[in-house]
Amino acid sequence: MNYQGQLSASWELDFWGKYRNNYTMLSDVLLNTVVSHEALRLSVASQTAQSYFALLALDMQLATAKRTLRTREDAFGIYTSRYRQGDITELDWQRARAEVETARAQVHSSTVAVDSAEASLAVLLGRSPRDIMSAVMPRGGDISKLPAPPVLPAGLPSELLERRPDVRAAEYMIMAYNANIGVARAEFFPSISLTGMLGTLSASVVNLFSGPAGAWSYGVTGSMPLLDFGRTWYNVKDAEAQKEAAIAVYRKTVQNAFKDVRTSLTSQREADAIVAASQAQVDSLRRAAEIARLQYDNGYTDYLTVLDAER
C-alpha cells in the first residue's frame, strides 16, 4: 500500500484573448450599470423639481379661483338686490348665479389638482404611506419671487450631448457586446493550460513527509471540442447581432437626445413669449380695474362695474 499527498495547480494561457475580452465586457457592463443609475437619479430629480413647481403653480391657480369666487359672489349679491327691486330681469340674475357656480366648481377642481400634485410629490420624495395620505407638503418660497432661469449661450457644441448618462450607457453596451464577440471567437481555438503537481509518495505513512518521498511533475495541456455542431459559429453570430442591436439603440438614444434639445429650446422660447403676453394682459386688466375703481369713487359708475373689472 502506498500513501501520497500532493498539491496541483493549473493556469490557462490567454493566447486568444478570451479572458481579456471577458474582463473588458464585464467592466463595460458595470460602467453601463453605474451610468444607468446616474441617469435614473437625474430623472427622479428632474421629475421631483417639475412636480414641485407644478404644485406651486397649482397653488396660484387655486388662490386665483378663490378670489374669482369671492368677486362673483359679491357681484351676485348686487344682482340679487337689483333683481328684487325690479331693475334687472331674471335672465341677468340667473346668468350671475351661473357665474358663481362656475367659479365654485373651478375652486373644487383646483383643490383636487393640488391634492393630486401633493400626493405625487410625496411619492417621488419617498414618503411613508401615512404621509402620502395625510401630510401637507411644505411649500417653501413664493414661485413669483424665483429668479429668472439663465439664458443659454448660443453656439454650444453638440458634443455636450455625449455627457448625457443615457448616451454614455448606450455607448458602454456597444463596447461590452464588442468585447463579447472576442469571447465567442476565442472558442474556435484550443484552450492551452500549464499544469504542475508537487507532492510526496511513500509506502509508509511515517516516511510520507520525510526522506526521498518527494514527487513532482509539470506539463502543457490543450483541449478543444472536436464536434460542436456549429455551436461556436452561432455564438459568434449571436454576439455580432447583439452588437448591431446595441448600435441601433445607441443611434436611437442620440436621436432622442437631439429631439429633447430641440423641444427644450422651442419650449423655452415660446414660454418666454407666453410670459411676456401674460404680463401685458395682467397690466391691462390691472389698469382697467384701477380706472373702474376711480370712476366709482367719483360717482361715474356703479360698484358692479368695479367687481366685473376686478374679476
Residue ranges and their predicted role:
Residues 22, 71, 95, 113, ...:
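Short acidic-hydrophobic sequence patches enriched in Asp/Glu that either
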Residues 3, 27, 75, 89, ...:
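Short, conserved phosphate-binding/catalytic loop or strand-edge motifs used
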Residues 1-39, 151-254, 260, 264-267:
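Small/polar-residue-enriched beta-strand and adjacent coil segments characteristic
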Residues 40, 44-67, 74-81, 97-100, ...:
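Amphipathic alpha-helical coiled-coil segments
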Residues 90, 203-207, 303:
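Outer-membrane beta-barrel proteins
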Residues 67-70, 87-89, 93, 107-161, ...:
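Short, solvent-exposed, mixed-charge loop/turn linkers that connect secondary-structure elements
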